[in-house]
Amino acid sequence: MTSTRVALVTGGTRGIGAAIVRRLAADGFAVFLSGRTEESTKSALAHFAKEGVSARGFAADARSEEDQKRLVQSVARDGGRLDVLVNNAGLGHFDRVDKLSADQFRETLETNLFGVFYAVHHAAPLMIKNGGGFIVNIASLASVNPFAGGSAYNASKFGLLGFSEAAMLDLRHDGIRMATVLPGSVDTEFGHSRRDASWMLAPEDVAEAVADLVRFPDRAIPSRIDLRPSKPPKK
C-alpha cells in the first residue's frame, strides 16, 4: 500500500472545491476530485495540469448513490487507499417557499444532504479497513442561520450539520474523525453577484481550514469550525 496520503474532494472542479484540491496537493496528498459531468471534470483537470497541480478525477453525480459508491471505490483502487474525504459538492435553489418547486427542493436536499450520506456510507468501510481517516463536510453558516428564500438550502445545511455531528459519534471509535466547516459568505460563482466582494471570504480561506483540520493530532477532533468574514458590511 502506498504511503502517500490520498484525498478525495467532491465538487472539486471550481470555487471552494478547487481551492481545496490545490491546497491538499501542495501539502503532498495524492488528490482526486469529482465533478458532476465528464465535461466539467475533464476541463478542471486540464486547468489544474496547466497550473502544475497534480490531480486525478471522476465524474459523479452527488444525487446518485451508485455514482458515489463507484467514485469512492475508484479512488481507493487507483490511489491504493482513501485517507481524507472532503464533501464539498453542493447547490442551492433560492425562492419563497410558496414559489419554490418540489423539484428544486428535492434537488437541493439530494445534492447537499443525501450526496454526503452516500459518500460517507461507502467511504467509511474503506477507511476502517485501512485503520481510519478524516472526513470534512463543507456546510455553511446557513446551517444555523435561517434566511428568507432559503427554505431548501437551510433545510439541507441544517440537516448536514446534524448528520455530521451524529455520524462523527458513530465513527470516531473506528479511527474516523469527522469535522464540519461552516463558512460565511465566500466570493465564488455560487452566490449572487455582488458589486463589492472585497469583504467576503476567499475560497482559499476555506481550503486553509480544511488543511488545518487534517493535520490535527489523531487524539483530537475539532468537530466544527465556524468561518466568518472579519469585516462584513455593517447593517
Features from the language model and the residues they span:
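Conserved glycine-rich cofactor-binding loop
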Residues: 13-14
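Conserved glycine-rich Rossmann-like NAD(P)H-binding loop of the short-chain dehydrogenase/reductase
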Residues: 27-44
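The beta1-alpha1 cofactor-binding region of Rossmann-like NAD(H)/NADP(H)-dependent oxidoreductases
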Residues: 38-39, 59-71, 102
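Substrate-binding pocket helix/loop in short-chain dehydrogenase/reductase
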Residues: 96-97, 101-106
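Active-site helix of classical SDR
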Residues: 120, 156
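Residue(s) in the substrate-gating loop at a strand-loop-helix junction
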Residues: 140
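C-terminal helical subdomain
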Residues: 173-176, 180-181, 188, 195-235
